[in-house]
From Swiss-Prot:
GO terms for molecular function: exodeoxyribonuclease VII activity. Signal peptide: none annotated. It comes from Ralstonia pickettii (strain 12J). It catalyses: Exonucleolytic cleavage in either 5'- to 3'- or 3'- to 5'-direction to yield nucleoside 5'-phosphates. The gene is xseB. This is Exodeoxyribonuclease 7 small subunit. Keywords: Cytoplasm, Exonuclease, Hydrolase, Nuclease. InterPro entries: Exonuc_VII_S (IPR003761), Exonuc_VII_ssu_sf (IPR037004). Residues 1-21 are annotated as: Disordered. It is an enzyme of class 3 (hydrolase). It comes from the Bacteria. One of its GO terms (biological process) is DNA catabolic process.
Length: 94
């Protein structure tokens, strides 16, 4: 049994707390997933972990969207969709 029972309280400690950073949210999310995958959490703790995980995923998506928007503003027209290679030469930018 790789996980100690002490890992479970983090799933429900502060369910609405905003993570300090994207990296902190991802680390907490990884811990929650590992706890849930272990199968050792009781039903209520699993539900709390799922809810917290959903909050963390939403937070991470929002952070990524904000960062993407900032990159778009900084790069202007330099960004092209990944599949749009027909009119660009990636080597020509160097």
């Amino acid at each position: 049994m790789p996980r100690a029972p002490n890992d479970a309280p983090s799933a429900s400690a502060t369910p609405s707390a905003t993570p300090a950073s994207y990296e902190a949210a991802m680390a907490e999310l990884e811990t929650l997933v590992a706890s849930m995958e272990s199968g050792e959490l009781p039903l209520e703790a699993s539900l709390a972990a799922y809810r917290r995980g959903a909050e963390l995923v939403k937070y991470c998506q929002q952070v990524l969207e904000r960062v993407e928007q900032q990159v778009r503003v900084l790069d202007g027209d330099a960004l092209k969709p990944l599949g749009d290679d027909s009119n660009t030469n990636e080597q020509g930018d160097a």
